[in-house]
Amino acid sequence: MKTIAIVGRPNVGKSLLFNRLCGKEISLVYDQPGVTRDRIVCCIKKEGKEIVLVDTGGLVFDCQTDLAKSLFDQISMAVEEAHHILFVVDGRTGLLPLDKQIAKFLREKHKAVTVVVNKLDHPGMEHFCAEFANLGFEEIFAVSAAHNLGINQLLEKIFSLGAEERENPIFAPSTRIAVIGQPNAGKSSLINSLIGESRLVVHEEPGTTHDAVEVGIEVCGVPFTFIDTAGLKKKNKLQEGLEIKVSGRTVHSINRSHLVWFIIDGQKGITLQDKKIGGLIQKAFKPCMVILNKIDLLEDRLNLKEGNKKGMLYVQEQLPFLSYAPVVVVSAEKKWNFKTLLSTLLRVDQERKKRIPTHRLTQFFQETLNQYPPPQVQGKRLKIYYATQIYDKEGSGGSPCPTFILFVNNPNCIKETYQKFLEKQFRQAFCFRGCPLLWKWRKAEGKGESSLHQDVILSR
């Protein structure tokens, strides 16, 4: 599979160009240098052919901080792995000394290079490309990523580089996992440790990740896509427009995921902000795993079995609304307890896709009501005629979580306390570990005295 890396100095429009070429907004775009930090990957297709595009951060050579060095290393790896380079420059500012440094860097890597002169926002500005011939590369394209000018011609060039024709897509459908938590909880470190390479920038400075970066791995032959997100900060700390946009993309990643990994700094413990993040997961009705990271830094060392048990009790006490979520204690740095982590992931993924036949559901609820009759409400007792599970082929249940419709005599006859009892009995029978359950109580046609036109939805 041909890989093309988009490279250039900061703020020349690489991420906007990447989004244009991919046909959707993947990389975060903001008018500030240094927004992109990790390598962002997208597979683009045309007439059955595929090419992988890689967006990179702004390339600079004066790496005075550890974070800057990490960013440089990420870009260097992207260049090494690429078959071809799109070298993006800014047509409005013209040729700068840093552009010449980058050109020298790319020549030393012995890579095929196409120069893309961006920000030529009006037809007829192609003459601005002339000075970039001094970079020493033969192919030069004039584009405006902002106004979609020259993009089709550039795509033609990209697919002429030898895109592969594939019967099966390179990125097979997979379970999408949003990896969320506070800044510096160890989200990127955990993903890097799982895949065995420094795919994501890791630094002690909170807020290193800006984009929601997707990384694919297989676990026992099952494909998963991890979405590494920016750490969610307190609202009063979202002072800049960029941080607000980053936070919004993180919430969006939760909504489009199938499952959430909630990473908590085990050394700091669960904070008020962690509880607010847990509330976002609950509100989104997402299957979830809670992962207590950095257990290698705890003074009170626990063996892993004891740690998992104590971690579960601690999370249930602090985050009772996520009581359905399994808890795993890990060390991303030391790669501790990864076997339990991945086996739990496989189990939760299976549970979220579980299907219970209508006849079994109906039998369960009718037997439970006969054995444990519900309390009367205004002289009426709840009756469940039959129950069914909603689902679609994708496996999300037509909903973020397993969803059930119960056809009853009167939805108003169900008390919340009795529903909690029913759910406890239900989980003992069918489990659904790691999954919230969504219940829709619907009046059966021709049953009962009143007619309700909407479902009564109670969920946990």
UniProtKB/Swiss-Prot annotation:
Keyword entries, A-Z: GTP-binding, Nucleotide-binding, Repeat, Ribosome biogenesis
UniProt-listed CDD domains: EngA1, EngA2
GO MF term (any one): ribosome binding
Record: residues binding GTP 2: 181-188, 228-232, 293-296
Function: GTPase that plays an essential role in the late steps of ribosome biogenesis.
Record Gene3D superfamilies: 3.30.300.20, P-loop containing nucleotide triphosphate hydrolases (3.40.50.300)
Lineage: superkingdom: Bacteria
Source organism (scientific name): Methylacidiphilum infernorum (isolate V4) (Methylokorus infernorum (strain V4))
Binding positions (GTP 1): 8-15, 55-59, 118-121
The organism's taxonomic lineage, starting at the top: Bacteria, Pseudomonadati, Verrucomicrobiota, Methylacidiphilae, Methylacidiphilales
Protein name (Swiss-Prot/TrEMBL): GTPase Der
Protein family: Belongs to the TRAFAC class TrmE-Era-EngA-EngB-Septin-like GTPase superfamily. EngA (Der) GTPase family.
Domain KH-like: 354-446
